[in-house]
Design a protein with these regions (language model features):
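Ferredoxin-type iron-sulfur electron-transfer modules in oxidoreductases and energy-metabolism complexes
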Residues: 2-25, 41-70, 83, 88-121, ...
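Conserved phosphate/anionic-ligand binding catalytic regions in large, soluble enzymes, centered on
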Residues: 31-39, 80, 184-206, 305-317, ...
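Iron-sulfur cluster-binding cysteine motifs and their immediate structural context
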Residues: 81-87, 485-491, 579-598, 609-623
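Flexible inter-domain linker/hinge segments
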Residues: 120-186, 340, 346-361
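Hydrophobic alpha-helical positions that pack around
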Residues: 140, 269-395, 407
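Gly-rich Lys/Arg/Thr-decorated short loops/hinges at beta-loop-alpha junctions or inter-strand turns
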Residues: 150-166, 218-230, 333-338, 380-385, ...
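Short amphipathic, charge-patterned alpha-helical segments
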Residues: 244-246, 396-411
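C-terminal accessory/binding modules appended to enzymatic or scaffolding proteins
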Residues: 375-387, 393-395, 399, 557-601, ...
């Protein structure tokens, strides 16, 4: 049925909500990429089979006898504890669910309404039955992620049931394009993909171009290592992003839009395609949207994994079928973007904020976050931290609150060393900066960038020189090679960093590193090139003593750099089993059975196989 008016939309919402209410129980199985990798599909299949066997129970949504629904949702947040399951109406949150647990869940929870307590999350000694009991979840403010983990990720009906497309109906029915732009501008919404350019200003610049053929493009090319925020939105609630893009198209007069998604996100592509087809079926996308005379067609373009295609002009070049390479600006994308036409280019999270701004108003949005950075920000929290996963917090939240209150602190009580923010183009922040607010302007003052929102927490066992080398290796390989500064500058910086971690560095290397980093930062063609040296700049500034130790003392205090460590066997712990010698690929270990063994460090290749295979902690490392 095509929805032609706000009244039709409200009727559909009421109809679907009645269907949902008729369920005695809903089983929400997290079916984001992380949980699927942990076996969530098996959980879904097993629960579906078991629920179908119950008399009068159906897995599909039906009008006649719907009692139990088994639903695939998007990411429920606690990625490390998957597979995850939530049971309504009891609001039980189960973690680490296995196929063999499903029968007990059906018998105890679905049929009797009782919890399976061993599947609850535990915060130290505290049992947390409900999501609101879990510190990782109850200290978040969810706008972009509000539906992720709560609705069927493959059902536009469920999105409509929670108020989906009402913002679009409001726009089409009672707002002019300029009024939409004014509201987004007033909200202070800034692009969530990197530098934080005001979204309303960008839309306004496109709308006033003389050229009438315009495009709306979504950057879903999330290439930062350890970042999965945009992918989770596209997997868990693609409809919100699509609604935001449709509103943007109405505001700037565009009839075609493109979603640029990494080929490494097959689940996102699948669910986006489903969402587009469903929206077209209901008249919420395509020709004559909501009987308004407005047309907007949405297309998906799959990227080939090039990190540089996250840069605007490289992304549009890739959509056009050309090699993804940044170009000189001006003209900027708002003037000459896709196929030389004015183009609105924002990322997934930016568009996903728009429907709520339209419905609740710009003033409401500005009550969240900071004066200069209103709203919330999603982050992927990873690294040496107790609770890794997907979070959304108000702009201005401190790193200390995120790491210790939401993330649960560092694993095994290790000492905090630093946090990498902004991915390979970001910077490392230290203990003294944990209380700095996380917003665009504050982070920039700390020689870092917000980026797409990756947060990698590092403890005392992390070598910061190796961290800089790792990220420089990534950016050097991903450099498009168009400008000499980035192509050659990153290569030379990588060569110096590799010398230092190999124990062959000299003190003059540090001055050369700084000179090269400043040159690339000031002279590279595109934003990615300009930010590529940030990991080097920030680690040199805050961990210079580690660089000097590597060079002068030939020592890696974290015992990470292979060339600067030696393996030894403690004769007091060694029982002479010979397992280390059997697993040494270099034949560097000698000894007799039932007598302590010995490692010849002149032969040792420092692979660590001996330490990994020793069951008695007899092998130790010296830096």
């Amino acid at each position: 049925m095509s929805i032609k008016s706000k009244e039709d939309l409200l009727n559909k919402q009421a109809e679907v909500n009645e269907q949902i209410k008729s369920y005695t129980c809903r089983v929400l199985v997290c079916s984001g990429t992380g949980c699927i990798a942990s076996g969530a599909q098996k959980i879904y299949d097993e629960m579906s089979i078991l629920c179908e066997r119950i008399d009068g129970v159906t897995v599909e949504m039906q009008k006649d006898v719907p009692h139990v629904g088994v639903i695939k949702t998007g990411c429920q947040g606690l990625c490390e504890l998957g597979p995850l399951m939530r049971i309504e109406p009891y609001d039980y949150q189960y973690v680490h669910v296995q196929p063999e647990d499903c029968k007990e869940i059906v018998e105890r929870t679905i049929l009797e309404g009782k919890p399976v307590e061993r599947l609850f999350y535990r915060d130290n000694d505290t049992v947390c039955p409900h999501p609101d009991d879990i510190p990782f979840l109850n200290q978040q403010t969810r706008i972009v992620l509000e539906n992720c983990g709560k609705i069927d990720a493959e059902s536009i009906e469920e999105y409509i049931a929670v108020g989906g497309y009402q913002a679009l109906a409001k726009v089409m029915g009672s707002m002019s394009p300029q009024e939409v732009i004014d509201e987004v501008t007033k909200s202070g919404l800034r692009g969530r993909g990197g530098a934080g350019f005001p979204a309303g200003k960008k839309w306004s610049q496109v709308a006033r171009q003389a050229e009438k053929t315009r495009y709306v493009v979504c950057n879903g090319d999330e290439g930062d290592p350890g970042a999965f925020m945009d992918g989770s939105v596209m997997e868990g609630d693609p409809y919100k992003m699509i609604e935001g893009m449709t509103i943007a198209a109405y505001a700037v007069g565009a009839e075609n839009g493109y979603i640029y998604v990494r080929a490494e996100y097959p689940l996102s592509v699948k669910r986006l395609r489903m969402a587009i087809e469903q929206a077209e079926k209901y008249g919420l996308l395509g020709d004559n949207i909501l009987n308004s005379g407005v047309n907007f067609h949405l297309h998906i373009n799959r990227g080939a994994g090039a990190f540089v295609c996250g840069e605007g002009s490289a992304l549009t070049a890739s959509i056009e079928g050309n090699r993804g390479m940044p170009r000189v600006k001006p003209p900027r994308t708002v003037e000459k973007g896709l196929w030389g036409k004015p183009t609105v280019l924002n990322n997934v999270e930016t568009y996903a904020n728009v429907p709520k701004i339209i419905l609740q108003g710009a003033d409401w949005f500005r009550t969240i976050g900071t004066e200069g950075s209103p709203g919330t920000k999603t982050f992927s929290l990873t690294g040496s931290i107790e609770n890794t996963g997907l979070i959304e917090v108000p702009m201005g939240t401190t790193l200390r609150h995120i790491i210790y209150d939401i993330g649960g602190g560092l694993k095994s009580g290790a000492a905090f060393k630093g946090v990498q923010i902004g991915g390979p183009s970001g910077g490392c922040l230290i203990l003294d900066q944990l209380d700095a607010p996380l917003d665009f302007d504050s982070v920039k003052k700390l020689d870092a960038i917000m980026g797409s929102g990756g947060l990698v927490v590092m403890d005392e066992n992390t070598c910061m020189v190796e961290v800089a080398r790792f990220f420089m290796n990534f950016t050097q390989r991903e450099s498009c090679g168009k400008c000499v500064q980035c192509r050659e500058g990153t290569k030379r910086m990588l060569e110096i960093l590799e010398r230092i971690v190999d124990g062959k560095g000299e003190m003059s290397d540090l001055d050369e590193l700084e000179e090269l980093a400043n040159m690339v930062q000031n002279m590279a063609l595109c934003g990615l090139g300009k930010s590529a040296p940030l990991p080097v700049i920030s680690t040199l500034k805050r961990f210079r003593d580690e660089y000097e130790e590597h060079i002068c003392d030939k020592k890696c205090r974290a015992k990470v750099c292979t060339a600067l460590r030696q393996f030894h066997i403690n004769p007091e712990f060694c029982i002479g089993c010979g397992k280390c010698a059997k697993n040494c690929p270099a034949g560097a270990i000698s000894g007799k059975i039932k007598h302590p063994y010995h490692i010849d460090n002149d032969i040792c290749i420092k692979c660590g196989a001996c330490k990994d295979n020793c069951n008695f902690d007899a092998v130790y490392v010296e830096a």
